[in-house]
Design a protein with these regions (language model features):
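Conserved acetyl-CoA-binding loop-helix of GNAT-fold acetyltransferases
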Residues: 70-84, 217, 223-240, 258-263
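Conserved active-site alpha-helix within GNAT-family acetyltransferase domains
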Residues: 75-76, 97-116, 223-224, 228, ...
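Acyl-donor-binding surface of acyltransferase catalytic domains
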Residues: 35-36, 42-43, 49, 56-59, ...
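Conserved hydrophobic beta-strand within the GNAT/NAT acetyltransferase core sheet
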Residues: 60-62, 91-95, 212, 246-250
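A short beta-loop-alpha structural element at the N-terminal edge
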Residues: 1-9, 138-153
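A conserved beta-strand-loop-helix scaffold within acyl/acetyltransferase catalytic domains
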Residues: 20-26, 53-58, 164, 168-216
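C-terminal "cap" of GNAT-fold acetyltransferases
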Residues: 119-143, 247-255, 265, 271-279
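A short, internal acetyl-CoA/4′-phosphopantetheine-binding micro-motif in the GNAT/acyltransferase core
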Residues: 58-71, 215-222, 251
Length: 279
């Protein structure tokens, strides 16, 4: 199994989603490798595969090592993915960063863009502000081993229309709790006066970036400003941790969320595009 983390480079978006990494480790994804096309480095040792593709649940993600680009590696990986039998061939593909090479491959195979996912960034504030909790509400850290079921129910309801986030399972959540970046104190739970979970703000702090991993508000409470409350609470949590920026991902057509984040000082940093195969 190739080290997928070895394909991450500092100035490019991560080539694989967290869910893809979880599924690869769990053996729920197909991993394709294109071998090193060069005899090796100065010491005669190959640098590893030139490229890797991951296919899971009908979706394709792939990456080509920077030094191996321009040699047709991406095209060969796509061809191999499309040749998978047993219904495993992908019908969707993600281009993280939407590079010209990805667009060229999509055009070659007649794949059309169907979704955009925007990465927004903002400076980390120098001081936190009062989040403005509603009367009777409380904000507390997630308790591993205790809060999973409550949070999963909230997440499923809040993201019912989101293909990836809303389908998170207990196994998916536990896999993320096992990640080095996970900290229960960075998953803030907002409860209403009755003690019921009203919302949550999950932060992923890694490589100098404080990402708003998932901000969820219970559907019956949406439109009441709780998203802003959670955003302010999350930003306050990032203060003083030596981070370069705070970041988040949002669907390109989610205008209410985009408006909230822009009011919070976020601007576009990168874009991911999902392509669909022709019918």
């Amino acid at each position: 199994m190739p080290d997928l983390g070895a394909f991450v480079v500092p100035d490019e978006p991560p080539p694989f989603s967290d869910q893809s990494l979880v599924d690869v480790r769990a053996g729920r994804a197909v991993v394709l490798e294109e071998p090193d096309g060069v005899a090796g480095g100065p010491d005669g040792v190959a640098a590893g595969p030139d490229g890797v593709a991951v296919v899971r649940e009908g979706e394709l993600e792939l990456v080509v090592r920077r030094e191996a680009r321009g040699r047709g590696t991406g095209t060969r990986l796509v061809e191999r993915a499309l040749a998978l039998g047993g219904g495993a061939a992908p019908r969707l593909a993600w281009a993280h960063g939407d590079s010209p090479a990805a667009r060229a491959i999509a055009t070659r195979y007649g794949w059309a863009p169907t979704r955009t996912l925007l990465q927004l960034r903002a400076p980390v504030p120098t001081a936190g502000t009062d989040p403005g909790l509603p009367t009777g509400s409380t904000l507390a850290a997630f308790r591993p081993g205790t809060d999973e079921a409550d949070w999963l129910a909230l997440n499923a309801a809040a993201f019912a229309s989101h293909p990836e986030q809303g389908s998170m399972t207990m196994d998916d959540l536990l896999a993320r709790e096992a990640e080095p970046w996970f900290d229960g104190a960075d998953l803030l739970l907002l409860r209403d006066a009755s003690g019921a979970l009203a919302g949550s703000c999950w932060l992923k702090v890694e490589d100098g970036i404080g990402e708003f991993y998932a901000v969820a508000v219970r559907p019956d409470l949406q439109g009441q400003g709780l998203g802003g409350v959670l955003m302010r609470a999350g930003s306050a949590r990032l203060v003083g941790r030596g981070l370069d920026a705070q970041a988040l991902y949002v669907e390109g057509d989610n205008e209410p969320a985009l408006a909230l984040y822009r009011r919070s000082g976020f601007t576009q940093h990168a874009i991911d595009v999902q392509y669909a195969a022709p019918a």
